[in-house]
Amino acid sequence: MNQSIQRSVDGLAPPGADSLPVWCVRAGLPAHLTAAQAAFLIASGFTGAAGQVVLVPAPDGIAGAVVGLGEDRSLWAHGGLAHALPEGVWRLEPGDFDAGQAALGWLLGAYRYAAFTPAKRAPALLTTDDALVIAIARATALARDLVNAPANVLGPAELAAATLELGAQYGATAQVIEGDACAEGFPALYAVGAGSARGPRVAVLDWSGVPDGGAAPLVSLCGKGVCFDSGGYDLKPSAAMLRMKKDMGGAALMLGLAALIMDQRLPVRLQVWIGAVENMVSGNAMRPMDVLRTRAGMTVEVGNTDAEGRLVLCDLLTAAGEARPDMLLDAATLTGAARVALGPDLPALFAPHTPAGDRMADAILAAGATTHDPLWRLPLWAGYDPWLATPVAHFNTVSSKPMAGAIVAGLFLQRFVPPGMGWAHVDTYAWNDAGRPGRPEGGEALGLRALYSAIVELTNINLPKKSRVHVDV
């Protein structure tokens, strides 16, 4: 089965479609209502509280809908409307809210993964001509689709093919490195995927937002694409393995971010490195206490085969760093320790405490606050670095101590990043355990809006207001 990245945006109405109005208020009633309509809303118990939705009658059907926002000023205030309103085409009337963020909340909430079964009902459609909102919704849907795809549909070959398809869509050059070339150039990554009948590969995408490339800043994105993680010989228990199709969530996030950058034609040079592998058990699989060579020339001892994501990323970071990018970002569903510390909604952000690292971290955190897409910075605490020591290799893949797992994983990756480079590492969950307004259960592109907005700020791109992501919080 093929996994195509081509899709429409759920909840988006065709341009020029006839529509019904939606009036959103924070308290009381909309001023324009007739006396009869106002009496109907009062009788319905409408007060403007968050989550209230009432259809306003008209002699020939429905005049529109009135929605309560209460004090919620996030985009999630509008996140449930695509499924709270009847099927049809609607428009948001101006009110005390950010129109772009309201539209984005609507479209994000309209998303459903329906590759194998039809949706129970179509979402209510929204009219909007905000190109950035539509692009964010499309990029988010791309990432969600990739994470939601079952592992028998999305393996290493299909994830690499999705990268090629994305490149072709935006006029980028892209290639896939596999076989002997992958084993030679990305030996640690290759060792992770060697146990699967579906071989490992690296997909690389190059794109320039300016005609000749020129002196445009180089942004490099690296994504962990473990399409299924059994844990290897350190086998996961059944409950922990259940959702491991989502272990390529970092790659999905980076592809969604790349799609948004290219769609908005940011004046940057972009490189994307996707490590597409499957961590399985076989006679060819890596074993505990194996010693592996990395692209950087350093050797690592495999302390646990279920700590495979850092082996994928270390070779990708080395390759990306060779081009000396102005910004180097990686994303991965890397550690359970990050989830213990921060839960499912807050990706952990790591960056070196250097001028370049602090600048990146500060920009990402600020962007997360303004886009309602938060991350939380954890330290790359140098005092824990000795915990990676081993007598048989340059260092181990895992800590010798049963604590600070997310930090030690970040310290491992930092060894493969050139000193002084602007680098940030995102340890994400990539999943919504339960549905909420704007955030359906399943795959999620946590951090996408924050990272995009931070790239705009960090590269000093002078964009019109509509090309910047913002929400009042």
Report residues per predicted region.
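A generic structural signal for tightly packed, nonpolar segments enriched in small/aliphatic residues
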Residues: 160-473
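Short amphipathic alpha-helical segment within the helicase RecA-like ATPase core
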Residues: 1-225, 466-473
